[in-house]
A protein has these predicted regions:
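Short, compositionally biased "basic patch" segments
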Residues: 139-156, 218-224
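A short acidic (Asp/Glu
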Residues: 63-65, 106-112, 158-161, 193-200, ...
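Primarily hydrophobic membrane-targeting regions of prokaryotic envelope proteins
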Residues: 12-17, 97, 149, 186, ...
Length: 273
């Protein structure tokens, strides 16, 4: 960097082109045979604060205590499954995590034995041991690195838009009844002015990929909001293409541009970035 006079603490396009000619001696004009480029971020002296939050949540599958719709949750909890891999990522040093108490209630129920709904009868579930192992690993997570989300993660934008103002009250009551004793943060895919105002009045902080990640925390209305990056969507630029490596390059470049970054990890692939 110093040799070519480029300042540090900046992001640059770096690429290479290969040209060639099939004619002896290069008698004809050379043509492009290949090219590649990527983003390269040169760190400065000021460290960039990056907070990684592993999101432990899943689509509900419990119909009533001890009865589940299917064994989809068992697949996610088993070794190599999405939730197992996310839990392993949450256990890494310096990583924060957020758990939906509704998920924890379902896994706890599974670990005690459960059946699958198969009218007019039921069949035994197969995920008891996977649930027990997952719970043991979850209980080993450092509590100081964790928060809990609102129970069941309701769509507050849709609920408040439909006039169902009691949804948030019921959700907060269920969250408190879970007894986890962790700080509460609303992890929401989408937010609007009404939902942020309602959460702000209840002093519930918000982490959302639906808010521009221009700073780690911002006050929007009365709510403390962290705009998060998920890096789940493919990179559609023809200049660099899409791969785990290019997503990592983009993540670093965005972090340098804003000075800080909250990464919300919801998939094992995103955990690798």
């Amino acid at each position: 960097v110093a040799d070519i006079g480029l300042p540090r603490d900046a992001t640059y396009w770096v690429g290479a082109r290969a040209t060639g000619s099939a004619a002896p001696g290069g008698a004809t004009s050379a043509s492009l045979t290949g090219q590649g480029q990527t983003l390269a971020t040169i760190p400065g002296t000021t460290p960039v604060r990056v907070t990684t939050v592993v999101d432990l949540g899943a689509t509900p599958r419990r119909l009533r205590p001890g009865v589940f719709l299917d064994d989809g949750l068992a697949v996610e909890l088993a070794p190599g499954g999405r939730l197992r891999r996310l839990l392993d990522a949450a256990a890494q040093p310096g990583v924060s995590w957020a758990i939906d108490p509704a998920l924890l209630a379902e896994v706890t129920d599974m670990a005690d034995g459960y059946v699958l709904w198969a009218p007019p009868t039921s069949i035994p579930g197969t995920g008891v041991e996977a649930a027990k192992a997952w719970l043991a690993a979850y209980r080993a997570l450092p509590a100081a690195s964790g928060v809990q989300t609102l129970y069941g993660r309701p769509d507050l934008v849709g609920a408040l838009g439909a006039g169902a103002t009691a949804v948030l009250d019921r959700t907060q009551a269920a969250t408190a009844a879970s007894g986890l004793g962790l700080p509460v943060v609303a992890v929401a895919t989408r937010v609007d002015a009404a939902s942020l105002a309602a959460l702000g009045r209840r002093s519930v902080a918000v982490v959302s990929p639906g808010v521009a990640a221009t700073s780690p925390w911002a006050l929007i209305g009365d709510a403390a909001v962290a705009g998060a990056e998920t890096f789940e969507a493919p990179i559609r630029s023809p200049l660099i293409g899409d791969s785990p490596a290019t997503r990592a390059d983009v993540a670093v470049a965005l972090a340098r541009a804003t000075g800080a970054q909250v990464r919300l990890v919801r998939t094992p692939d995103a955990a690798a970035i």
